[in-house]
Amino acid sequence: MKLTFRIEYRTAWGEELGVILDGNNSEPIILRTPNGEHWEGEAEMPDLPACVPVSYRYGVYRDGQCIRRESGTMAHLFCPGKKKNCHYISNDFWKDLPAESYLYSSAFSGDYQSETTIKVTASADGSITFRALCPCLHHKRQVLAISGDCPALGNWDIQKTVLMEEIQPNEWTITLNVSTLEFPLSYKFVACNADSKQVEEWENHDNRMLNNPELKKGEIYLTPETEVHFTSSARKVAGTAIPVFSLRSEKSFGVGDFGDLKKLIDWAAKTHQQAVQILPINDTTITHTWMDSYPYNSISIYAFHPMYIDLNQLGKMKDKEALAVFEARRQELNALPQIDYEAVNNAKRSYLKVMFQQTGRKVLASAEFKKFFEENEHWLLPYAAFSYLRDLYGTPDFSQWPEHTEYKAEEIAALCAPDSSCYEEIAFYYYTQYHLHIQLLDAGNYAREKGIIFKGDIPIGISRNSVEAWIEPYYFNMNGQAGAPPDAFSVNGQNWGFPTYNWEVMEQDNYQWWQKRFRKMAEYFTAYRIDHILGFFRIWEIPSHSVHGLLGQFVPALPMSVDEIQSYGLPFQKDFMTKPFINEEMLNKMFGDKAAFVKETFVQHAHDDIYEMRPEYDTQRKVEAYFSDKKDEESIHIREGVYALISNVLFVPDRKHPSMYHPRIAVQNDFIFGRLDWKEKDAFNRLYNHYYYQRHNQFWYQEAMKKLPILTQATSMLVCGEDLGMVPDCVPWVMDQLQILSLEIQRMPKNPKHEFGHVWEYPYRSVCTISTHDMSTLRGWWEEDYEQTCRYYNHVMGHWGEVPVSAPGWVCEEIVRHHLECPSLLCILSFQDWLSIDEEIRYPDVNTERINVPANPRHYWKYRMHLTLEELIKNKKFNEKLVEMIDTTGRF
């Protein structure tokens, strides 16, 4: 079998084009060119299997190294026939991201497997294979066909169209005898009903033309893979967002588990939803207390939290007395209105220990487990060792361990060896993770079978006391803390405590750390949310000595020199502008009758009415330590005030170049800004606005484009970005270029001139929602600010008269319907907001429905749905209402 590749691509001097066949580890097929633009090359491929799609990609090479390759997870395709002496001539265009790349994702394409053998018949006179890319068809409801101006293509008769075959998701092909065609050939693609085969729509394109390729005997001409679009086929989907821990079923053990996901998927399918979104599910076990309930502080980017295991799938416990005790405990915990994190985890861990003793050896000896271990050993072994050592030494802080503070693979391999004295304790973690893996895999496959997009969540950070920080410290900056500048969630900014990434080191191996993480996630999910996508442009890095986020700076960034600061007309005074400004008036105003105590304890007199921090309390961490055992309201007020003293500066020194500076974020609200005269304020504001909103756009664009194209194309999952907060102009540039779905929330409009977003103006390539886990629910928000609610009721909903203090069901239904009607591709609403439309089943206590309060770093994540999934599935009235709303808004 001979292959000829032809492509037009303009190269620079010294560059050449090559072709790599996927799955073929041989050297690239280097093409020839007469002019640096038209390239052609041949290869003999006698061993290619018949009737099986063959994929290949083009790349640009210089000095034998590939310097650029085609974008995306999509390759060129053709399907060889059974005849071995054929000559395939492929005519191609270079493939960058297709116009609707998100529709080619596994979220919409699924894991396609052809149900029949692909038929490719090559005629003696030569054949033409028409190739088309079409992501717009409704999966399993429509097929692609071709119609044209000759008898072989039906002479434009819609009853005689020629059906094509889908050889890969969205990739359609048909091979016709060249002698049956008439040239020049005019043709178009059409969408047909999969059952009746009747034409439902013609493609939105002029007639396509094909001249006679003048083929020789045995030659098969492959047309370029052209994109096909239809006007009326814009997909729109509705879905539900809910954490796994919040699920409740009749058989769950006080917390949602992976088994409950299948019931959630059943309910979603029953109500014509096509998406289910969850929060991160990785192991966060650090202290074995409720503090570990925060799902974004994982100790492993691969291991799942043991509390999500469905104990019912482990088999029957032989010890009947123990089983009875566990069943009583299960019923007790499952009856609680919220999660008792510590009780649930202790009980489920004890249950797992019993089952490990009963079935562990058999499971670990199975072929299925051995395959799992072989494929996951690179993370599973260090995770198990870390978990064992964490409990052995009573701390997750590996720098405090008496042994193994520095990860050495040989030592850890010996610790985890089957002949090790602690092997059984290590193997317990293998056993647990194996069952979690097969249960989540089962849930993910079930979602695919049901046509449900299964959307996961990629946290931006990791715990500084984590497996990855232990075994791969070179990937992280451990001397800083990741967070976010002040926003609607927190006036002092957010300090997540995560180490920041060492992107320079990650770039050296093409971001393999991230690519492996995404590929692992793709085993289970078909879509994912990039938590805080802004972190791939720049991260808000807070000094390790800070508690609040106000003293942070963007990394990477372009700090300002003293000369540049002064060029704005602002005379630079280092001590006044970079050290905490504290005077008598400020102390009295902030602390009132406690000002004397603050003077005696935390500050000391400098000169005139000016004070400075005492050395023993000159950082927020030192102050935090002083108040560690003081929890009364007055102490907390003083502590927060002293924090504010320390952050009362106009400029923050750059972390690497201390003679250069960053304007302190949101300083216009602090005392020091009030000390400036009007000219200085004007100069500072001009400097500030340029620095935060203009200076870095190109710089951060380039930073993001180093990383995100590689990461988003590492898998076929649908990519959604959480682009909230302080969003620079370059973020939508990158998201548009890479076709990443944005997040649209009406109460957090992207247009700063609007109080509320206009849902009808949302971009198609977006996810719209009413509230996220970091926000109050729809009903909770309605009750927060009555004046704002009135404006929304009048100006957005168009209603007048008395505004209800609490949102009645009809108000919630109207708001939900407006969101379903918006142009967004995905409308994924929180479970609580779906329930808000029905006053009979929604939970009476609005406040308990909130999942997280970002301003509180010690928030207890314990929300749980108040009714069971079984009850939800049986609620005919509510479910029929959802079906009506979803169907009439075109989302099914």
Model regions and ranges:
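Glycine-rich, flexible loop segments associated with nucleotide phosphate handling
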Residues: 52-54, 811
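Short amphipathic alpha-helical leader/targeting segments
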Residues: 50-51, 72, 78, 160, ...
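Aromatic-rich carbohydrate-binding modules that target alpha-glucans
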Residues: 2-52, 61-82, 133-183, 192-215, ...
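Catalytic cores of glycan-processing enzymes that make or break glycosidic bonds
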Residues: 100-123, 127-129, 177, 211-892
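Extracellular carbohydrate recognition and processing domains
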Residues: 97
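Intrinsically disordered, low-complexity regions enriched in Ser/Pro/Gly/Gln/His and often acidic
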Residues: 31-33, 87, 163-165, 195, ...
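C2-type phospholipid-binding modules
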Residues: 77, 81, 85-93
